[in-house]
UniProtKB/Swiss-Prot annotation:
It is found in: Secreted. InterPro entries: Antimicrobial_frog_2. GO terms for cellular component: extracellular region. Expressed by the skin glands. The lineage of its organism: Eukaryota, Metazoa, Chordata, Craniata, Vertebrata. Disulfide bonds join 24-30. Keywords: Antimicrobial, Disulfide bond, Secreted. Belongs to the frog skin active peptide (FSAP) family. Brevinin subfamily. This is Brevinin-2Rg. Antimicrobial peptide. It comes from the Eukaryota. It comes from Pelophylax ridibundus (Marsh frog). One of its GO terms (biological process) is defense response.
Amino acid sequence: GILLDKLKNFAKGVAQSLLNKASCALSGQC
């Protein structure tokens, strides 16, 4: 449903920002 899609998109956004933070911290390019 729509709610599930919203949850999926939200989770995707959170995961993406976490990945970005992690890779930027690892490479030291924050």
